[in-house]
Amino acid sequence: MSSRYQQPFGKTKSAIKAIASLVSNTFSRQLGRKFMSFFLAGAIISVTMAACTATNPNSGSPDAKKDVELTLVSFAVTKKAHEAIIPKFVEKWQKEQNQKVTFKQSYGGSGSQTRAVIDGLEADIVHLALAADTSKIEKAGLIDKGWEQEYPNDGIVSKSVPVIVTRDGNPKNIKDWSDLEKEGTSLITADPKTSGVARWNFLALWNAAFKKGGSDEKALEALTKVYTNVPILTKDAREATDAFFKQGQGDALINYENEIILASQKGQKVNYVIPEVNISIDNPIAVVDKNVAKHGTKEVAEAFVKFLYSPEAQTEFAKVGFRPVDESVAKEKQFVEQFPAVKNLSTVKDLGGWDAINKKFFADGAAFDQIQAKIKR
């Protein structure tokens, strides 16, 4: 037994001797000896157990649980929302489950985050820009099939829409997607081959052109005009934003509504329009089943994901520009004013789902490559 357990036992020796003496005087010598042997053994065991219990530094509340750590991997623009939400969940979980939760957080482009998880970044939870990225992790064997049905809204926990950012005063009078087809209108956007945001941009343009022209041929023609007006395709949305704002390139920029709202909150003056025919940018959440099984974090990971759908968490998403998926939050006056209704809003499902979309638009030789070939970029 270590030294920290010996002191309480030592203090009890005199008490044991006194009791033993009393027993000896009360009973006969033979009976007393037998009784005292049993009594001393029991007393020593009892006192030793009491001493160990009293001084063991690892003992605490009988309901206390071992600390747990979660790794959250998400796309870059969610950082501010998660930094506000995580402390609320940690406090709630500690109060309800008597368990301390800490978070490791990683933020970056959705595509690069997807590759990192597949290559070994042991995320417990992934919150990505598009379901196609989550599906890649599923196909790598890390997420179980059917993850979309595990949580409300087909796993979509945050939403936005593409908007067109213009120069101060909108000198090119850009009001809709079709205005980006006009000769002499320079557009800044990223490459859909490398950027998740740019894929949403492309789909918004295609969706509007198809509904206006009524055929794939008309849509392809319209988007060829649009991309002819793009001087250079940047690698990602951040480079596109820098090219427009910092370098002064282009007459227009396509970006997430939430990015523009956040920029406005930081004091940056931004002029933008929300086209009436648009597409919902849906961002999914998923638990990485293989990793939570390895880490023993399934229970708390699932609880955190469920918490993200709560009005409390959805309010934090809305504060930084994401359209809430919780209807009660969406109906709050401040958010009704912040997020104008879009008259004709399509979804990925309306376009056939991500497998069909990737095959039709972004695979080698598909629509985007055909457009690039026509303009000989």
Protein language model features and the residues they cover:
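Extracellular/periplasmic juxtamembrane helices and adjacent flexible linkers that interface
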Residues: 2-4, 292-377
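C-terminal motif of bacterial Sec signal peptides marking the signal peptidase cleavage site
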Residues: 48-51
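N-terminal segment of the mature folded domain
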Residues: 53-194, 367-377
